[in-house]
Amino acid sequence: MSSFKKEHPFEKRQAEAQRIRSKYPDRIPVICEKADRSDIPDIDKKKYLVPADLTVGQFVYVIRKRIKLSPEKAIFIFINNVLPPTAALMSNIYEEQKDVDGFLYITYSGENTFGQ
């Protein structure tokens, strides 16, 4: 279970997601957290309002910048333990994979693909 889910009760999360969706219908409420046991840096904020027309690849770029990941390091994002297609629109992923509370939960992990 994500730490966001542990820290915030279901009713509160659901109410917040509904408020966000009604106030910003063209945005997707996303919770992005680092995978357990990953050696990649922690992200400075977990909650994102992502434009619906953003691709998964563009969102990965946003994450890379936020955690200041060097170019030789790889980053992988998972939604419900599945690697989403890079070209997929966040709006499509949201409709298919959103949690019952209304948020889309994304986990990121990394490994150095070029070795050291």
Swiss-Prot record:
Which CDD domains did the record assign?
Ubl_ATG8
GO-annotated cellular components: autophagosome membrane; cytoplasmic vesicle
Propeptide section residues:
116
Post-translational modification, as annotated: The C-terminal Gln residue is removed to expose Gly-115 at the C-terminus. The C-terminal Gly is then amidated with phosphatidylethanolamine by an activating system similar to that for ubiquitin.
Q: Which domain of life is it from?
A: Eukaryota
Residues lipid-modified (Phosphatidylethanolamine amidated glycine): 115
Q: Which InterPro entries match?
A: Atg8-like (IPR004241), Ubiquitin-like_domsf (IPR029071)
Asked whether the UniProt record includes Membrane among its keywords, one would answer: yes
Q: Where in the cell is it found?
A: Cytoplasmic vesicle, Autophagosome membrane; Vacuole membrane
- Which keywords label this protein? Autophagy, Cytoplasmic vesicle, Lipoprotein, Membrane, Protein transport, Transport, Ubl conjugation pathway, Vacuole
Q: Name one GO biological process term.
A: autophagy
Cystine crosslinks:
none
Pfam families recorded = ATG8
Question: Which residues are listed under the site Cleavage?
Answer: 115-116
Query: How does the protein's chain sit in the membrane according to the entry?
Result: Lipid-anchor
The keyword Magnesium is annotated on this UniProt entry: no
As for what it does, the entry says:
Ubiquitin-like modifier involved in autophagosome formation. With ATG4, mediates the delivery of the autophagosomes to the vacuole via the microtubule cytoskeleton. Required for selective autophagic degradation of the nucleus (nucleophagy) as well as for mitophagy which contributes to regulate mitochondrial quantity and quality by eliminating the mitochondria to a basal level to fulfill cellular energy requirements and preventing excess ROS production. Participates also in membrane fusion events that take place in the early secretory pathway.
What is the similarity comment for this entry?
Answer: Belongs to the ATG8 family.
Per its record, how is this protein called by name? Autophagy-related protein 8
What is the protein's species of origin?
Answer: Phytophthora infestans (Potato late blight agent)
